[in-house]
Swiss-Prot record:
Family (UniProt): Belongs to the Pup ligase/Pup deamidase family. Pup-conjugating enzyme subfamily.
Protein name: Pup--protein ligase
TM ranges: none
Known pathway: Protein degradation; proteasomal Pup-dependent pathway; Protein modification; protein pupylation
Alphabetically ordered keywords of this record: ATP-binding, Ligase, Magnesium, Metal-binding, Nucleotide-binding, Ubl conjugation pathway
Catalytic activity annotation: ATP + [prokaryotic ubiquitin-like protein]-L-glutamate + [protein]-L-lysine = ADP + phosphate + N(6)-([prokaryotic ubiquitin-like protein]-gamma-L-glutamyl)-[protein]-L-lysine
Source species: Rhodococcus opacus (strain B4)
Residues of the active site: 57 (proton acceptor)
Keyword ATP-binding: yes
The protein's role, per its UniProt record: Catalyzes the covalent attachment of the prokaryotic ubiquitin-like protein modifier Pup to the proteasomal substrate proteins, thereby targeting them for proteasomal degradation. This tagging system is termed pupylation. The ligation reaction involves the side-chain carboxylate of the C-terminal glutamate of Pup and the side-chain amino group of a substrate lysine.
The encoding gene: pafA
Short name of one Pfam family: Pup_ligase
Miscellaneous comment in the UniProt entry for this protein: The reaction mechanism probably proceeds via the activation of Pup by phosphorylation of its C-terminal glutamate, which is then subject to nucleophilic attack by the substrate lysine, resulting in an isopeptide bond and the release of phosphate as a good leaving group.
């Protein structure tokens, strides 16, 4: 499947600092954030004009699920659009707090852990054919996903009883299973709950919940692009060396704690391999696969950055990727800050900087400051991100959903939508079932819109 439906779901961390005496719980802050949404959507679980879903998840975490995308740049644009949507809610909520005499600054973090040790996720979704052998996909993907943090982790300072240590991944410490149907209780690497949001006879949805939330556009593209390419190779019958892990949960933590990528992890049967070895194998197969597939500049870009990042890890010279990969950007930032101020990695100011890197408010968040200074590479433009805030992808089913929502809102009609249904809540209860996520034109939807 060279054209694939993909999406990213991001849960955001929330906190608020107060200027006055009255303090609000995270639940109350979340309610302020979503007050504007509830006022027009009558719910804290809504679909937007750009086809995305916005809702309040378990534990007062706002969650943004992008619309269905079918190429990587489009997906990065819609992922970044989610930050803008949440930033607008943040600004609106701060104004409401001020009007009510509760002075406070609200912070939304696109990260995966809070100071209390709780974790919240960034989930990737990939459409796969129902006909394929799902267990083979899981078997081949698992070693890739366990070691993928080496190339696209968000980076984190982990405070251990002995000392502070820099880790590649925020999510690795919170994963407890390889493949499972649960998402919160056991936090697997791959979630197998079968909810295709499409024709269940043709498709299923691969739900990857091990990844970090990325600030860097290049890292987001690399994270999703490499996974999509490995999936494509599995479907094409490409054979890989057997890297089945003896204990994926131990391995994911060992890999996260080793920025050299050389620490051996145990494979099934007693063999050993490093994260660098494993990623080199997948990358080598990808380079070969590119010779046999239709040319795609985005995929070529992904394979190029993948190779450059592995070279950087091998040589420990990150100069050629230090504007593109989150954990490299962050580690360089920490090292400069430590050198300038003489801080240890365990200093609370480093932890503060770690958190501020993920602050999505423009002009305040550290990543945004680096971006404005030209210290991180971009693959999108502000104009295309702003467009994605209100406009759905034009090549997928999201276009139908977005057009229906826009038309219904402008006509003042009551409606209900989800990923596959578009329904007018009138006497006739007319509903269109959109089971094909690749289809962006549908006469039934056009007729439904025209009837408003």
């Amino acid at each position: 499947m060279q054209r694939r439906i993909m999406g990213i779901e991001t849960e955001f961390g929330v906190t608020c600092t107060f200027h006055g005496h009255r303090r609000l719980s995270p639940d109350e802050v979340a309610r302020y954030l979503f007050r504007r949404v509830v006022s027009w959507g009558r719910s804290s679980n809504v679909f937007l004009r750009n086809g995305a879903r916005l809702y309040l998840d378990v534990g007062s975490h706002p969650e943004y699920a992008t619309a269905e995308c079918d190429n990587l740049i489009q997906l990065v644009n819609h992922d970044r659009a989610g930050e803008r949507v949440l930033e607008e809610l943040l600004i609106d909520a701060e104004q409401r707090l001020a009007e009510e005499g509760i002075g406070g600054d609200i912070y939304l973090f696109k990260n995966n852990t809070d100071s209390a040790g709780n974790s919240y996720g960034c989930h990737e979704n990939f459409l796969v054919a129902r006909a394929g052998e799902f267990s083979r996909i899981s078997d081949v993907l698992l070693p890739f996903l366990v070691t993928r943090q080496l190339i696209c982790g968000a980076g984190k300072v982990l405070q251990t009883p002995k000392a502070a240590t820099f880790c590649l991944s925020q999510r690795a410490e919170h994963i407890w299973e390889g493949v499972s149907s649960a998402t919160t209780r056991s936090r697997p690497i791959i979630n197998t709950r079968d909810e295709p949001h499409a024709d269940a006879e043709k498709y299923r949805r691969l739900h990857v919940i091990v990844g970090d939330s990325n600030m860097s556009e290049s890292t987001t593209m690399l994270k999703v692009g490499t996974a999509a390419l490995v999936l494509e190779m599995i479907e094409a019958g490409v054979s890989f060396r057997d890297f089945a892990l003896d204990n994926p949960i131990r391995a994911i933590r060992e890999v996260s704690h080793d920025v050299t990528g050389r620490r051996p992890v145990r494979l099934a049967g007693g063999r050993q391999a490093s994260a660098l070895d494993i990623q080199r194998e997948y990358h080598a197969r990808a380079v070969e696969h590119l010779q046999n597939r239709d040319p795609d500049p985005q995929v070529t870009q992904v394979v190029d950055l993948w190779g450059r990042m592995l070279d950087a890890v091998e040589t420990q010279d990150f100069a050629k990727v230090d504007t593109e990969i989150d954990w490299v950007i962050k580690r360089k930032l920490f090292q400069r800050y430590q050198d300038r101020h003489g801080f240890e990695l365990a200093d609370p100011k480093i932890a503060q900087l770690d958190l501020a890197y993920h602050d999505i408010k423009r002009g305040r968040g550290v990543f945004d400051v680096l971006q404005r200074k030209g210290l991180v590479k971009r693959i999108t433009e502000d104009e295309t991100i702003e467009a994605a805030v209100d406009t759905p992808p034009q090549t997928t089913r999201a276009k139908l959903r977005g057009e229906f929502i826009t038309a219904a809102q402008e006509a003042g009609r009551d409606f209900t939508v989800d990923w596959v249904h578009l329904k007018l809540n009138d006497q006739a209860q007319r509903t269109v079932l959109c089971k094909d996520p690749f289809r962006s034109v549908d006469e039934r939807v056009e007729r439904l819109i025209a009837s408003m």
